[in-house]
């Protein structure tokens, strides 16, 4: 996908690894909508583990946060994405195992019973 915001150099730590098993997973590249983000350290970040909704056949169209009755989850964001300057590239987990102990508490609260039902047979949520 085209990096629409240009190339930027930032120094950061290693990304949070939310996978329970890194070998057994399937993920795809997507665009992530700014509206799905939360304010953190002066930036707008969509956190790893956020359930997202979008069209997997039109992944260039920005994915949004999953919502009851209107936007069912089709996957889970694999890594934090900075959307401060608008939609940005991200990775959507569409099949695999998420370790809930590695997802921050605010994001884990978004993984409701409805989200688990929508992702049943695709994404499993476990704790170690």
How should these model regions be labeled?
Residues 1-128:
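Surface-exposed, low-hydrophobicity beta-strand/loop segments enriched in small/polar/acidic residues
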